[in-house]
Structure formats: C-alpha cells, structure tokens
C-alpha cells in the first residue's frame, strides 16, 4: 500500500498489478478510510488513465456475481451521472423504449447522487422491483428484453465507500467505473460522461474491456446525447475509435432549450416518462429520448444511420407499445 500511495503522490500511473491489488484490497475492506480518501484524491489530481480504469473495472467484475447467461450481445446505456443539471431520466426512458423494440437491454444503474431521480429511483417510482433476484431478472429479461441490475446488489465496495466518497466533494474514479461494471458484461454500450475530456479515455477503457461497439458521449455538459447543444462523441467501431461532434441536424430533429429538460422533483420525472411512453410527452422531452434510442439502434446495427433510427423510433412510439411494455416489466419484476 505504501508503494502505491508513493507512486500516486509522485503522479505516476499505477501498473496493472498495482491497480488489481489496490481494488482487491478495497473490495475486501483492507484499505482504511484515510488511505482510500488519499488514493482517490491522488488519482483524481494525477488524472486516471484508461488502463487504470479498465483494470479496476475488470477486478470489480471478477468479484461480482453474474445473475444469468443470456447468450446475446447485450446492450447498456448507463452513464456516469454527475452532471448536476437535474434533467429527466433520458437514458432510462430510452432503454425502456429500445427494449420494447426488441433490443436486449441490460440496464445497470443506481439511485440518484446529483439529480432529482436516478435510474433506480425512476424505475422504483414507476412500480418496478429494482432488487430482482437472479431468477426474476432472467425471466423478466427473456420476456421483455429488459433487465435492471441495481448496482449496490452486485458491488458492495461501491455501497460501503459511498459515505467517504460523498465527503470528498468531488468526482472520483468510482464515477467512471459505474458504467463499466455491469455484471452481465454488455458488448454494446452508449455511455454518457459528465465531462467531455473523459470521452476518449472511457472509449479506450471500453475497448480494453472487450466491448465490441460503443459510443461515449457528452452533450452540452450532460452525460447524454442532446439536441440543445453539440454532443461530442467517441465511437468504438471495428476496434478503432472515431471522434466527432453531433448536432440536432444529424438526427434531422429540431433543437430544444436545456431548460425544457430540467425537472423540479422525482414526481415530474415519472410523469415525463409515462407521457413519452404513451406518445403524449412534450416534444422537447420526446425528441431527446428519440435521439438516444436512435443511437442504440445504430450501434446495434438495427438502423443504418441515426436518421433512420429516429424514424423507426417515432413510428414505434405512435403504437404506444412502450407503455404496454412497461406494464409487463412491472408485473414480471414482482413475479
């Protein structure tokens, strides 16, 4: 531990063995709160490398139970959170719609830290059992193409270190790790990050973890694809990383103001979700979700480009099938 701390104090990247040792100790609660605080802050100041992030994620996954084997190339659109802008739950609503279109969505998430409503909060408030046992989860997924994996059930180190991390008043490597440690190990990911500078780092981490296809995005300071501003993207395709910017024009959608996406409380988030699924949501809410679903369709080769993905999603919403789909998820999550 002393060698690890000294390396970080001198702003040196840790090698793979040191990262694996460090996170194994963290998992087994062999690191004191003072040491953990020092390590997280030193990593933050140095800047976490993609190798440190990917090896830490691999170590955490090795200690996380895998609830079932699907035999599919699963998809996740879990983001880092932490943008503090208190918008509707874009990625969670997008995951519900995408799964109703047949995409195999394994949604990894937790409760809110910086927003009014995290993915777990929204789903729970909608009536979904977010703490499904492995049998319930597999059954729900097989019948709906949607499964929610509540992070604290699979990663105790996150849960136990949460009070300390909260007292640091800064984002740490744990924020980056959240979207990378889905126990079902999805092969396709749409991953939002709270800072544009993380896009390339996280894309490299996904590549190192063996993800086949991904897009890491930051849209106007949010960890989502947005229509009110430029979305910076790093796309992992054919084992190469392509870096580019997206705007509303790339989706053939109109721009909307960020303020229209912001909410005052969790109740508003629930209502926004239900309205979108029933195809009666505000245009600003619906269209930003549609852009994110379109990106999932593109990444999974169901749409040839983003504009086709948008048209497919808009046509699907007209059927109101996503709302019926949600009711089925709610019922099966409690079965």
Curated annotation (Swiss-Prot):
Its EC number is 2.4.2.18. Mg(2+) 1 binds at residues 91, 224. Anthranilate 2 binds at residue 165. 5-phospho-alpha-D-ribose 1-diphosphate binds at residues 79, 82-83, 87, 89-92, 107-115, 119. It comes from the Bacteria. Mg(2+) 2 binds at residues 223-224. GO terms for biological process: L-tryptophan biosynthetic process. Its cofactor is Mg(2+). InterPro entries: Anthranilate_Pribosyl_Tfrase, Glycosyl_Trfase_fam3, Glycosyl_Trfase_fam3_N_dom, Glycosyl_Trfase_fam3_N_dom_sf, Nuc_phospho_transferase. It catalyses: N-(5-phospho-beta-D-ribosyl)anthranilate + diphosphate = 5-phospho-alpha-D-ribose 1-diphosphate + anthranilate. Pathway: Amino-acid biosynthesis; L-tryptophan biosynthesis; L-tryptophan from chorismate: step 2/5. Binds 2 magnesium ions per monomer. One of its GO terms (cellular component) is cytosol. Keywords: Amino-acid biosynthesis, Aromatic amino acid biosynthesis, Glycosyltransferase, Magnesium, Metal-binding, Transferase, Tryptophan biosynthesis. Anthranilate 1 binds at residue 79. One of its GO terms (molecular function) is anthranilate phosphoribosyltransferase activity. Belongs to the anthranilate phosphoribosyltransferase family. Homodimer. Catalyzes the transfer of the phosphoribosyl group of 5-phosphorylribose-1-pyrophosphate (PRPP) to anthranilate to yield N-(5'-phosphoribosyl)-anthranilate (PRA). This is Anthranilate phosphoribosyltransferase. It comes from Helicobacter pylori (strain G27). The lineage of its organism: Bacteria, Pseudomonadati, Campylobacterota, Epsilonproteobacteria, Campylobacterales. The gene is trpD.
């Amino acid at each position: 531990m002393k060698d690890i701390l000294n390396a970080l104090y001198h702003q040196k990247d840790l090698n793979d063995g040191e990262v694996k040792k460090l996170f194994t100790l963290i998992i087994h609660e062999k690191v004191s709160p003072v040491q953990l605080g020092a390590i997280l802050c030193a990593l933050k100041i140095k800047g976490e490398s993609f190798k440190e992030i990917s090896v830490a994620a691999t170590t955490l996954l090795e200690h996380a139970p895998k609830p079932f084997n699907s035999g599919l190339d699963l998809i996740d659109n879990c983001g880092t959170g932490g943008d503090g802008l208190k918008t509707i739950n874009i990625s969670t609503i997008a995951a519900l719609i995408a799964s109703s279109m047949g995409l195999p969505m394994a949604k990894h998430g937790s409760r809110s830290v910086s927003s009014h409503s995290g993915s777990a909060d929204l789903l729970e408030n909608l009536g979904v059992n977010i703490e499904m046992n492995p049998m319930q989860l597999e059954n729900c997924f097989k019948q709906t193409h949607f499964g929610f994996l509540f992070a604290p059930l699979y990663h105790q180190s996150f849960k136990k270190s949460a009070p300390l991390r909260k007292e640091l008043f800064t984002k740490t490597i744990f924020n980056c790790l959240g979207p990378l440690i889905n126990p079902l190990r999805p092969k396709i990911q749409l991953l939002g990050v709270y800072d544009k500078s993380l896009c390339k780092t996280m894309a490299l981490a996904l590549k190192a973890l063996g993800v086949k296809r991904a897009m890491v995005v930051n849209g106007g300071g949010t960890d989502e694809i947005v229509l009110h501003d430029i979305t910076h993207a790093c796309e992992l395709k054919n084992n190469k990383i392509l870096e580019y910017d997206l705007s509303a024009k790339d989706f053939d959608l109109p721009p909307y103001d960020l303020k229209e996406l912001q909410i005052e409380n969790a109740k508003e988030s629930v209502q926004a979700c239900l309205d979108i699924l029933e195809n009666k949501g505000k245009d600003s809410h619906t269209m930003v979700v549609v852009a994110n679903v379109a990106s999932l369709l593109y990444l999974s080769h169901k749409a040839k480009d983003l504009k086709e993905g948008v048209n497919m999603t808009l046509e699907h919403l007209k059927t109101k099938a996503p709302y019926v789909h949600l009711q089925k998820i709610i019922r099966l999550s409690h079965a």
